[in-house]
Amino acid sequence: MVYLTRKTTRGQHYFYLVKSFKYDGRVEKVQRYLGSEEPDEFELERLKQMHTNELELAAIERMAHMSSETYRTPYLDKEALLGLERMKFLNRAIHRLQTTDEKVREHAKNRVATIYGNMALSSNPLTYENIESIFDQDRAPSGLPLSKVLEVLSLRRLHGEISERVGRLGKRSILKLHQDLFEGTGKGGVLRENSANLPGSAFMPPPAILVEDELEGLLQWWHDPSPLHPFERAVLFHHRFQQVRPFESGNGLIGRLIMDGMLIRAGLSATEFSNYFFLVNLASNRIEPFEGKLQIPM
């Protein structure tokens, strides 16, 4: 809400445009000085049109600073945290200001981009145009195997549900997610029973007999209170999930899908972090390979 207010000091009037907003249960304000003369109704509307976006950004900056101070982390510096919080509050403001049609178009575009980014790291990835074509036609474009089409359609459905599913994340829900992704193939929803490796890495995942315990430990860590930023926690969860490698196949698709849900719940667009999925392949059991490579908007 943007409105005109007057302040009086030593008998002199000063006029400001003020935007009020709620943060953490309290009302905060940002303002812009207009001068000592009160604008008429026409001029006030012109000034509102001129300065509303500026005040909106000032409110976002204020909220980002206050919010970033609540996290304690060994991984991200202050500016990176601030950039993430700016992104979160900017996404929230854009969503509030968008029309219903704009939201629908953006959701459709982001869904294609996110699924393309997820599948780009899988074996036999599809092109962006392939995925768009499958979405438009709900059938296999010429030359594409039916299994890939079904995988894309499953990812489309699960992408719409993943935020809610991550809200109740547990071993059973992860198994169900894997089962739903590979529905009809007979290979979904079961923890691996054989040894595994990480392609291109010297790191060896835990033996099959320890997978269930490792997964339970990771989930316990996820649900424990933490001073880390949600983005960091999502990155660390994803990284460790890939190390555990709980399934015979589909670990990358499931891990990235879960991380998408974590980012969405944190108010961060999953499409902003597609580069992360390429960087994760550089790491074994360390976080250092990510430092300096994740580009956080400032």
Locations of regions flagged by a protein language model:
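FIC/Doc superfamily catalytic core
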Residues: 2-249, 253-298
